Design a protein with these regions (language model features):
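Domain-length accessory/inserted modules outside core catalytic folds
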Residues: 3-5, 53-57, 61-64, 91-94, ...
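Carboxylate-rich helix-loop segments that flank metal/cofactor sites and access channels
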Residues: 56-90
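Alpha-helical transition-metal enzyme core signature, strongest for iron centers
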Residues: 13-24, 40-58, 101-104, 125-139
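Short loop-to-helix capping motifs
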Residues: 33-34, 117-118
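The feature marks the first
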Residues: 1-26, 30-31
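Acidic/histidine-rich alpha-helical segments that form the ligand environment
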Residues: 13, 20, 26-27, 77-116
Length: 142
């Protein structure tokens, strides 16, 4: 499904963050992942903040929206299933978390490029991408 405008880019960002929040909250409660519970709880809290950031960005910039469509940007490369988080081993949960962080960094980087016409929105997307990059680096050392 194509991401054709400002609203669809931010709506999809909100969907990704909601999926991430659910995944991290679920693996934080998974006894097999107890060793990384604090990290996953922090990631869930960060995802919740990112949802609010996406919503606020959409709300504050809707009047500046440019109707020019976004081209060549689709959801497919950023869709990832996270089923079974409640029964994953710690190793599988960390591997999935790494994939989710990589996906988020890629999405926010590409989205910021595609929405350059709205500098405030592009900046917000870049900032969210940087936050995910920090999380990705935390996961890389585990």
């Amino acid at each position: 499904m194509p991401l054709e405008n400002f609203g669809s880019v931010l709506n999809f960002a909100e969907e990704l963050e909601t999926q991430d929040q659910l995944f991290y909250a679920t693996v934080a409660a998974n006894p097999a992942c107890a060793e990384h519970k604090e990290l996953f709880e922090q990631f869930a809290a960060d995802a919740k903040k990112n949802i609010k950031t996406a919503q606020r960005t959409r709300r504050e910039n809707v009047t500046e929206m440019i109707l020019e469509p976004i081209k060549d940007f689709v959801r497919a490369p950023f869709c990832e299933e996270c089923a079974g988080a409640d029964s994953m081993s710690a190793e599988d949960a960390l591997a999935t978390a790494r994939r989710l962080q990589e996906r988020a960094v890629n999405y926010y980087t590409r989205a910021a490029e595609k929405i350059k016409a709205l500098p405030e929105v592009s900046r917000a997307l870049k900032t969210m991408g940087k936050k995910h990059n920090v999380q990705r680096e935390k996961l890389a050392v585990l």
